[in-house]
């Protein structure tokens, strides 16, 4: 990256080219610290995160998003969506706060009959919540994985025993999943939306909250 930055100085238009990290799988703070230690941090314009998610909603484990978030001491500390975003955002702030955050792999796969994945209905709901949370956190870009079922090395292939074939929003027979409808509606509703804050419910429901956009 040092060589690239040196070349960029040769032409003004090249200096506008942004360099972001490759997709870091989960909020791997140890790896991020290593980037800082080896001098790579100051050469990056942004951090790319694959937040990942298991069999819980995207807002897990952030209970009160209006408060500072600390990684839980036990349970699923790592492979969660919103928790990972908050951890990496905190890391960016700790090291200067001058890096954009990119989510390069949001997903809501619906591999059937498996406790670690969503049902088709859950996938639609969780896709919407994933993007709403990303918008609330000021994420620069959030890319969904992926449009069609199947995998890159078996285009339009079918494998009922491999969960990697079920990340798409469109089935192999080209029928639409509920998640595609959710994606279209989310894109329309959040287009140019500005995050205004968290809606806190009454004292009887302290864990209930909403997200306000304008």
Regions found by a protein language model. Give the residues of each.
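Aromatic- and carboxylate-lined catalytic core of secreted/periplasmic carbohydrate-active enzymes
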Residues: 131-214
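Noncatalytic carbohydrate-binding groove/subsite architecture in carbohydrate-active enzymes
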Residues: 1-130, 137
């Amino acid at each position: 990256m040092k060589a690239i930055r040196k070349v960029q100085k040769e032409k003004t238009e090249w200096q506008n080219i942004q360099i972001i990290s490759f997709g870091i799988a989960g909020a791997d703070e140890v790896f991020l610290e290593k980037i800082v230690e080896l001098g790579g941090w100051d050469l990056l314009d942004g951090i790319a995160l694959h937040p990942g998610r298991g069999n819980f909603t995207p807002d897990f484990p952030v209970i009160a998003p209006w408060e500072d978030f600390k990684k839980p001491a036990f349970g699923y500390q790592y492979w969660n969506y919103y928790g990972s975003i908050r951890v990496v955002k905190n890391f960016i702030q700790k090291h200067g706060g001058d890096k954009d955050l990119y989510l390069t792999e949001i997903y809501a796969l619906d591999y059937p009959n498996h406790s670690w994945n969503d049902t088709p209905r859950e996938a639609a709901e969780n896709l919407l919540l994933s993007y709403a949370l990303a918008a609330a956190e000021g994420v620069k870009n959030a890319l969904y994985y992926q449009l069609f079922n199947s995998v890159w090395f078996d285009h339009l292939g079918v494998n009922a025993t491999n969960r990697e074939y079920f990340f798409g929003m469109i089935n192999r027979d080209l029928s639409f999943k509920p998640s595609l409808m959710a994606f279209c509606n989310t894109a329309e509703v959040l287009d140019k939306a500005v995050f205004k804050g968290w809606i806190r419910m009454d004292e009887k429901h302290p864990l209930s909250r909403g997200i306000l956009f304008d």
